[in-house]
Amino acid sequence: MQNWLASVAVVILTSVGIPTTSWALEFTADRVTHTDRGFHHARIFYHDGMWRLEHNERGPVSVTIVRADRNEVWHLLPVTHHYKTVLYHPDYALHLATTLDDEISRERIGVQTLDGHPTVLYEVLTVSPGGGRASYYQWIATDINFPLKLAKKDGDWMVEYRHVKLGPVSDVFFELPRHYAPMDGDQ
């Protein structure tokens, strides 16, 4: 009986717009980016403002850990067991919202299936503080409410998330390994 009452209370509260709980976004995925320098593949682990990218390029594996909460980014070099610390910059930010910064219009273009997820494709127009405009295509997965793909309309760049798994990600992924030493010049 108590479970039934609790369920009814949650339904009533959410239907009138009162949040009952806020959940942090946590997921793992394969991330593919395309720029004028080619395609880049990485495995991403994300937990509420912290993320780890394990780059899958030719040569030695490298890892980037972004800690926006600490205003730091660590570039790990597993071959030498060293790391380099740099300051966090907004350029490191991921495009994980279902709306874009400085968005001024959004038009539904159609529906598609990406990586097994039903998506709605939008054309989005943004304006920069200087007045410049940019157009994007954004694919939002409707089953998991997640932006699977974002591409600049002119083809300049694209980011896509594949094999997205929503769920808890251990904090261990976002800490420096104990046996790593700072590179010369780092503290």
What are these regions (language model features)?
Residues 57, 62, 115-180:
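Gly/Pro-enriched, hydrophobic low-complexity segments
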